[in-house]
């Protein structure tokens, strides 16, 4: 901007495209002060070096004419944080000079000439305060702003030269503190008094010269209330684009009779609300995909039944178990009236319990838990591969060399405790299921799926499986 008018300038349509650096790393350029870099706005900066003084003057001048810091940042190609910091410091202290990079401020040592002048002022006017003496030193050009002693230093000199009582000293210190707070350095009176008393030699320096431009104090703005017509216009524009450019915002501001800044803030808030609503909708859609109830990790199970150590001899099999290696199996969910311990009547040599002992022609004993029909309803049950021994798996794959068995297929009847033909099992199950239909919906049930003996050899034939609950059997299922 070459000239600054009182009104905020309108943005012009851009001319030919400018090639700004698009890479993620800033470009390095050579400057008289050293190696500089290019920021995201295209401006050159040097790390560790303050912003040049003429740019600081320009920032204050543009802010004095009512231009917003974001516009100043774009036009001067200075970062927004730098612009805000310079303006904030100028409002507080009236100075645009950069702060100290590091270290502490050197202690001011009062010269003898300054001490004599302080004593002279005090003799001429005994009621003069320390801050008044300090202002008079600046006004008479005895000191400049860099060498003038502080209020506390002047008070210390006065106490040493003019001895007073402790009460008078305390009263003087209290009054001086109150007056110094009223006319602090960053106050309007302090800035004006320092500027008026500044020596003429300092005005020629570019660093020490301060712009004499009062800035408007930032006041809290009342919340904007939009009318229905304005909201309708803004919503229509938001449906077209969520990120309108400066020209679209200005046109929309003219139609809605708002400022471009209010339109920009409204779009920012509207985008935030839209993102929040979109996230909530995605979460609801995801919840609809999830089934209503996942089974918990530990489902409530029915009380487990343990078989007593006493083995009951089945009435249908006259031969007792004589193999010491035979084991009594204790399934967890079965009622205590069933004991799976029997022998094969057609093979008296083996005297092995069906599916329980480990002999050369029989299956190895199952583990103490059965396989659930589906899913992890009971996490304590292993898979069926854990219940079969390697000898059984070898028998299933090798059908040769196995002695011939009778023609009848036998299946274990858990309710009678012995071996029965499959027809009798079905009959007995149908009789017991007449009064147990209400138990089909029990949550935890397990199936006992025993293998059968076939005519050609040992194999796993699909037979009817039974699910056992707490009180009886449920509907049969097959593999």
Curated annotation (Swiss-Prot):
The modification Phosphoserine is found at residues 201, 205, 209. Residues 1-21, 165-228, 309-351 are annotated as: Disordered. Residues 172-188 have a biased composition (Basic and acidic residues). One of its GO terms (biological process) is sensory perception of sound. Changing residue 80 to D: In WS1; results in decreased transcriptional activation of MITF; no effect on localization to nucleus; no effect on interaction with SOX10. Its main location: nucleus. Residues 113-161 are annotated as: RED subdomain. One of its GO terms (cellular component) is nucleoplasm. Keywords: Chromosomal rearrangement, Deafness, Developmental protein, Disease variant, DNA-binding, Homeobox, Myogenesis, Neurogenesis, Nucleus, Paired box, Phosphoprotein, Proto-oncogene, Transcription, Transcription regulation, Waardenburg syndrome. Gene3D superfamilies: Homeodomain-like (1.10.10.60), Winged helix-like DNA-binding domain superfamily/Winged helix DNA-binding domain (1.10.10.10). GO terms for molecular function: DNA-binding transcription factor activity; DNA-binding transcription factor activity, RNA polymerase II-specific; RNA polymerase II cis-regulatory region sequence-specific DNA binding; sequence-specific DNA binding; sequence-specific double-stranded DNA binding. Residues 309-329, 338-351 have a biased composition (Polar residues). It is found in: Nucleus. Coiled coil: none annotated. Residues 37-93 are annotated as: PAI subdomain. Residues 34-161, 219-278 bind DNA. The record marks 319-320 as: Breakpoint for translocation to form PAX3-NCOA1 oncogene. Belongs to the paired homeobox family. It is linked to Waardenburg syndrome 1: WS1 is an autosomal dominant disorder characterized by non-progressive sensorineural deafness, pigmentary disturbances such as frontal white blaze of hair, heterochromia of irides, white eyelashes, leukoderma, and wide bridge of nose owing to lateral displacement of the inner canthus of each eye (dystopia canthorum). WS1 shows variable clinical expression and some affected individuals do not manifest hearing impairment or iris pigmentation disturbances. Dystopia canthorum is the most consistent sign and is found in 98% of the patients. Transcription factor that may regulate cell proliferation, migration and apoptosis. Involved in neural development and myogenesis. Transcriptional activator of MITF, acting synergistically with SOX10. Can bind to DNA as a homodimer or a heterodimer with PAX7. Interacts with PAXBP1; the interaction links PAX3 to a WDR5-containing histone methyltransferase complex. Interacts with DAXX. Interacts with TBX18. Interacts with SOX10. This is Paired box protein Pax-3.
């Amino acid at each position: 901007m070459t000239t600054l008018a009182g009104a905020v300038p309108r943005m012009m349509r851009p001319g030919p495209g400018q090639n700004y650096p698009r890479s993620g790393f800033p470009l390095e350029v050579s400057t008289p002060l050293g190696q500089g870099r290019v920021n995201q706005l295209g401006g050159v900066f040097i790390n560790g070096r303050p912003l040049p003084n003429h740019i600081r003057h320009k920032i204050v001048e543009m802010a004095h004419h009512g231009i917003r810091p974001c516009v100043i940042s774009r036009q001067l190609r200075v970062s927004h944080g730098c612009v805000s910091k310079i303006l904030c410091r100028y409002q507080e202290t009236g100075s645009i000079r950069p702060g100290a990079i590091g270290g502490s401020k050197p202690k001011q040592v009062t010269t003898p000439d300054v001490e004599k002048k302080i004593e002279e002022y005090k003799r001429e006017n005994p009621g003069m305060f320390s801050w008044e003496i300090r202002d008079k030193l600046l006004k008479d050009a005895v000191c400049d702003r860099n060498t003038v002693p502080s209020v506390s230093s002047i008070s210390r000199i006065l106490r040493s030269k003019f001895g007073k009582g402790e009460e008078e000293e305390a009263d003087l210190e209290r009054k001086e503190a109150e007056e110094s707070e009223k006319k602090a350095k960053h106050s309007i009176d302090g800035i004006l008094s320092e500027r008026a008393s500044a020596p003429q030699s300092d005005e020629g320096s570019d660093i020490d010269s301060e712009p004499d431009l009062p800035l408007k104090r930032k006041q809290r703005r009342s919340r904007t209330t939009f009318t229905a017509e304005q909201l309708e216009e803004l919503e229509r524009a938001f449906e077209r684009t969520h990120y309108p450019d400066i020209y679209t915002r200005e046109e929309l501001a003219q139609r809605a009779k708002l400022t471009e800044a209010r339109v920009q803030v409204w779009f920012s808030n509207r985008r935030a609300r839209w993102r929040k609503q979109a996230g909530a909708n995605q979460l609801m859609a995801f919840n609809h995909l999830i089934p209503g109830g996942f089974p918990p990790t530990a489902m409530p199970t029915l009380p487990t039944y343990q078989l007593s150590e006493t083995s009951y001899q089945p009435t249908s099999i006259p031969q007792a178990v004589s193999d010491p290696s035979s084991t009594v199996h204790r399934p967890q969910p079965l009622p205590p009236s069933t004991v799976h311990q029997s022998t094969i009547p057609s093979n008296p040599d083996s005297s092995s319990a069906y599916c329980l002992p480990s002999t050369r022609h029989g299956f190895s004993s199952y583990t103490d838990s059965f396989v659930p029909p589906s899913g992890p309803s009971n996490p304590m049950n292993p898979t069926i591969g854990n219940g079969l021994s390697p000898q059984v798996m070898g028998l299933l794959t090798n059908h040769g060399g196995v002695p011939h068995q009778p023609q009848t297929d036998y299946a274990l009847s858990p309710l009678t405790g012995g071996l029965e033909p499959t027809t009798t099992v079905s009959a007995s199950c149908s009789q017991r299921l007449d009064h147990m239909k209400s138990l089909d919906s029990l949550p935890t049930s397990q199936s006992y799926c025993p293998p059968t003996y076939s005519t050609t050899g040992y194999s796993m034939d699909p037979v009817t499986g039974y699910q056992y609950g707490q009180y009886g059997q449920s509907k049969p299922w097959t593999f």
